[in-house]
């Protein structure tokens, strides 16, 4: 489905991001994954190469909150491959600090990591995609962007921001053949969820109409669809991947 495509995936070393990288490789894309540390990038690359030595995958670890550093990396990728077809902004942090305990510095840190960093990757990519006649951008939002969360204001605020960025860019960039969408995962079996004791997991499952916790591959499948020609007329969509938790 993605044969010959060049994809950049931020936050691609573990969890949902790693699943997206793997899914894209399985479907013929060449992938450049971004991670926060060289150690985690190397570990992810080694794991992927062990699974299939033929996969064309490489990695980098620019600071996503440094606009120049990200732009330099994006431009280097473009020089090497001649294009960037797909950008997946998956990197981000969760947060549940209560409002009464959250100072402005902490609030700004979450916004910086979850919104500003997304913009930093999008801006240079858009310039290149416009020149090449199109492209696809996928942002990772969250189900809390639809209804907020009872504990912690910074994280849902940041994901509402991702939604606004996604929808506005879809309207702005459609004329250039650039599609912009987001996925909004629900409760997903990441490392954090997997570490929970069974007595805490069961109440979570009870809130999900489909009766199970999502897997990283569920989100990766949605990202595969959005990146493929099957979604050629889909843009500005915030695609819930949450087992009907929010509908």
Question: What is each model feature region?
Answer:
Residues 27-43:
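Conserved glycine-rich Rossmann-like NAD(P)H-binding loop of the short-chain dehydrogenase/reductase
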Residues 127, 171-175, 232:
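Alpha-helical segment proximal to the catalytic Tyr-Lys
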Residues 122, 158:
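Active-site helix of classical SDR
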